[in-house]
């Protein structure tokens, strides 16, 4: 991975890590499914009038929108509704990286080398340490945990659809994909909000919306979605899934740090240890070969 693409990947990690703080702020005044629906509404409109429809099969576009957008966030919000702590959900959701690599090996016959497997194993240990730290003193409903894993699997399926889309076109328009795929989850989210959150709650939330919620929506739509998914999709189309997907493991690290700084939450020793293990695993997985090549040239 080039330095430029590495920087872009880390930018997405920071944006998505801060996303959890923004979501928490936005949910103070608006129910989750409505917030998610409005997020994608802002992504699609008015941009859809200025961005050409992507030249990809409709089935792939539908699959992408229903998995990475609606499926991921519908399962995630239901998990939190059924008792899954939001912080722990942000960690368990990172299982998408391993689902993506497994699906990549099955669908695209991508081969993982031993150095990558070692890095992934180290990162998995780090995630488990973070989860153990978050589970300490908390009661977790099994339904919430399983729904969070379903959200992670939906995200991974979306990554695979994205890879297929990128393979379909030699020069894919990433922003076109992001904008047009945002159309797909709008109706499912709004219908789900109407059924699960109620018309009265929706009306009250819209009538009393404040500037904090508006700014949260703008961040979720234009920064986390258009910028974040646009860059992420381009990287998945340019590199093997095993190089890109594990980078998302840094998202909960940024999430924990930003929550500590912006929300006053504290990091325990176990959380710090987990973060270090994840970063070490990512270094081995993503940069291991480049270090060896550089060493050979220098020698």
Curated annotation (Swiss-Prot):
Its main location: membrane. Residues 1-6, 53-59, 109-116, 161-175, 238-243, 290-299 are cytoplasmic. GO terms for cellular component: plasma membrane. InterPro entries: AA-Vitamin_Transporters, EamA_dom. It is a multi-pass membrane protein. One of its GO terms (biological process) is amino acid transport. Gene3D superfamilies: 1.10.3730.20. NCBIfam families: PRK11453.1. This is Probable amino-acid metabolite efflux pump. It comes from Salmonella typhimurium (strain LT2 / SGSC1412 / ATCC 700720). The gene is eamA.
